[in-house]
């Protein structure tokens, strides 16, 4: 045993070589547990580690995979454009809350509302969402409305993230 993550109850095992590791994964692990060697694209422990380490590129790739796997019937309602953007905002809010991260949606500032603010011990993520727009438009809104200003007195690193969701993909 090389390590243990008490938060998720995960042990990190070390193997002397690839042959021993493959034997463990293929033969012993399935025999003693109901765990398969396959991992889902949205493995919650890895997602949390990416967020907490500031690896926003990796966690957004993981989210993109997660959203691509969402059945289209559960997304759009009476106002498809607005409902779709709200769907993505709600899913992100729920995911971040479920993993125990401090998350706020529609965070009010003196110049508008930030779609989502996510805070960890080291980072603050300011996220603005666009549907069928561009990430650049979302970033421009963060800048023009001064969404980072309320956090300027905080010593944590601030990430400004513009996110575009496509209703086509």
Regions found by a protein language model. Give the residues of each.
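Extended alpha-helical interface modules used as scaffolds for assembling large macromolecular complexes
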Residues: 1-137, 144-146, 169
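Nucleic-acid nuclease catalytic cores
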Residues: 135, 148-169
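C-terminal structured domain segments across diverse proteins
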Residues: 127, 141, 159-162
């Amino acid at each position: 045993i090389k390590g243990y993550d008490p938060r998720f109850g995960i042990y990190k095992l070390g193997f002397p070589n690839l042959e021993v590791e493959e034997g463990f994964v293929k033969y012993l692990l399935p025999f003693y547990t109901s765990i398969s060697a396959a991992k889902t694209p949205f493995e919650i422990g890895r997602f949390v580690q990416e967020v907490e380490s500031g690896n926003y590129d990796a966690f957004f790739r993981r989210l993109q995979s997660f959203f691509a796997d969402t059945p289209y019937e559960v997304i759009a309602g009476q106002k498809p454009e607005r409902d779709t953007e709200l769907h993505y905002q709600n899913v992100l809010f729920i995911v971040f809350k479920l993993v125990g991260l401090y998350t706020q949606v529609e965070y009010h500032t003196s110049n508008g509302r930030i779609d989502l603010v996510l805070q960890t011990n080291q980072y603050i993520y300011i996220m603005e969402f666009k549907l069928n727009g561009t990430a650049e438009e979302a970033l421009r809104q963060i800048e023009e409305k001064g969404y980072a200003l309320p956090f300027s007195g905080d010593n944590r690193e601030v990430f400004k993230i513009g996110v575009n969701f496509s209703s086509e993909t």
